[in-house]
Amino acid sequence: MLNNAMSVVILAAGKGTRMYSDLPKVLHTLAGKAMVQHVIDAANELGAAHVHLVYGHGGDLLKQALKDDNLNWVLQAEQLGTGHAMQQAAPFFADDEDILMLYGDVPLISVETLQRLRDAKPQGGIGLLTVKLDDPTGYGRITRENGKVTGIVEHKDATDEQRQIQEINTGILIANGADMKRWLAKLTNNNAQGEYYITDIIALAYQEGREIVAVHPQRLSEVEGVNNRLQLSRLERVYQSEQAEKLLLAGVMLRDPARFDLRGTLTHGRDVEIDTNVIIEGNVTLGHRVKIGTGCVIKNSVIGDDCEISPYTVVEDAHLAAACTIGPFARLRPGAELLEGAHVGNFVEMKKARLGKGSKAGHLTYLGDAEIGDNVNIGAGTITCNYDGANKFKTIIGDDVFVGSDTQLVAPVTVGKGATIAAGTTVTRNVGENALAISRVPQTQKEGWRRPVKKK
């Protein structure tokens, strides 16, 4: 169906008192992303010409957190209801566009449902998203005559008979810009709350003989709002369960779907295995036959085919070629790169460092601002001393180098191809190819030496 141009209004002015937080409610995160950002992303994916964000409490924090040139910021200085919020945005509506109204604390609304609502909107009428609940207490009821929607009655204003209605308003609707502005101008606050309800436009449209079409979401969770942290945590589990199900159906082996969190996007190959309590953040790519052990965190990284990441390893902004092994308890920080077949063992940290093909750093090592060649062995306790307190410097290690345990490489320094660094050496000057570098205090031995005894 050919749709009109459309703009989106997102209501995000609420304080969120029941969150007991200094952070605006809509900035609390679900799957690692602010709730309102989920809604903004949906609006952009729908192709919104403009996104009008109605804000009130915590406006400065919102503007700091949301970096989107497509956002038009609309202040609602006083929170006098949803109709009042829409009235603040109305001057920005074009007469010939559709206006879709969303909520910043309803984060799981799907693009598919919104597109169905958009397609269903009748010419000159309103598309309304509704659901049926076994217990509709507290929600606005949908009133009908002969099956046609005639209005919405808020729970506090409803009669006993109307409170028996199970079909409720989700608050999400779409209408033409010119119609919306006209109806908004007619709203009054003559109700129990003394507020301007956007829902009153349904009755106004009906009085004009306009058609109101109700559409239901695919899942109830799509229209569930968040008022407290308990509700947020429940929606988090709903979201994570849905993501885990998609991955399982796509061939990813999740050992326990209930103990897996996806906080971004995951691109994967075949026969990927992910153990329990793994967190995927940002944009992550896993190649074929990748295995990830329990308790790992992978963020904004590319993991090549046949890599194995052992338990409790953290990988952030890193790139691993094929057949690399990492961990357990390893940390790859931004700029870490492992070439094919490289190995990083337990308690090894890398940052802005490249480890060549077949090279190994097995234990208790820090490699920062380093370029390490192929088939290099980095002994336990090796440290690249890359920082002098003001500036950082690079360490370069050629192919086939053997670095003994407890070695310090004071950058800037270069170790030539095939060189050997003896255990316990502090390297302060360049080492030539195939040379042995050794710097130790000569060992002495004192016969009959006794340890000090505590004075009584």
Curated annotation (Swiss-Prot):
Gene3D superfamilies: Hexapeptide repeat proteins (2.160.10.10), Spore Coat Polysaccharide Biosynthesis Protein SpsA, Chain A (3.90.550.10). Residues 251-456 are annotated as: N-acetyltransferase. Mg(2+) binds at residues 105, 227. It holds the Pfam family NTP_transf_3. It catalyses: alpha-D-glucosamine 1-phosphate + acetyl-CoA = N-acetyl-alpha-D-glucosamine 1-phosphate + CoA + H(+); N-acetyl-alpha-D-glucosamine 1-phosphate + UTP + H(+) = UDP-N-acetyl-alpha-D-glucosamine + diphosphate. One of its GO terms (biological process) is peptidoglycan biosynthetic process. UDP-N-acetyl-alpha-D-glucosamine binds at residues 11-14, 25, 76, 81-82, 103-105, 140, 154, 169, 227, 333, 351, 366, 377. The active site is at 363 (proton acceptor). GO terms for molecular function: glucosamine-1-phosphate N-acetyltransferase activity; magnesium ion binding; UDP-N-acetylglucosamine diphosphorylase activity. Keywords: Acyltransferase, Cell shape, Cell wall biogenesis/degradation, Cytoplasm, Magnesium, Metal-binding, Multifunctional enzyme, Nucleotidyltransferase, Peptidoglycan synthesis, Repeat, Transferase. Homotrimer. Catalyzes the last two sequential reactions in the de novo biosynthetic pathway for UDP-N-acetylglucosamine (UDP-GlcNAc). The C-terminal domain catalyzes the transfer of acetyl group from acetyl coenzyme A to glucosamine-1-phosphate (GlcN-1-P) to produce N-acetylglucosamine-1-phosphate (GlcNAc-1-P), which is converted into UDP-GlcNAc by the transfer of uridine 5-monophosphate (from uridine 5-triphosphate), a reaction catalyzed by the N-terminal domain. In the N-terminal section; belongs to the N-acetylglucosamine-1-phosphate uridyltransferase family. This is Bifunctional protein GlmU. The lineage of its organism: Bacteria, Pseudomonadati, Pseudomonadota, Gammaproteobacteria, Enterobacterales. The gene is glmU.
